[in-house]
Amino acid sequence: MTEEQLFAVYTHVPWTRKVEDTKTTDPEGHPIELLYFIRQNRRDLVMKPNDEYGGKGIFVGWELDDREWDNAIQTALSAHYLVQTRVEVARDSYPSWNSDDEAIQWGEYTVDLDPFVFFGEIEGLLTRLSATALCNVTAGGGGVPAVSAKLARAEAAEAEAAE
């Protein structure tokens, strides 16, 4: 990898290790026993399978109790799993349509806003909302339109000026 690529990885990819009984370093670079670290830091970690998609097999530490987390570690040790530090994501209130009540209801959702960057320029967005920590569609998330309020105001001002 080039220096620029390495910088991008270290800047944007959270601390990641293969789940195994080994010595390594923690996110600050201190030596650790990895399994002990994983057990002690459940609320700040997520474990992900190497060969799955759509949120299948992901263990979100802050959503599990200690017993469930220990079971997750055993599962991770028997397969190919990675452990990563938690990345804080936005949660906010959004309206949704409740077809049972035929009414709009407000709820708190996890926001997943993923820019498509080409040659240093943002060329588009993928935006999803989810009632859970996982935003992918198979885990209950849903794609939603992204609207730039700044751009919308500018276009509205242009339209008003044209009238």
Residue ranges and their predicted role:
Residues 1-91:
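Active-site nucleotide/adenylate-binding loops and adjacent lid/helix of ATP-dependent enzymes
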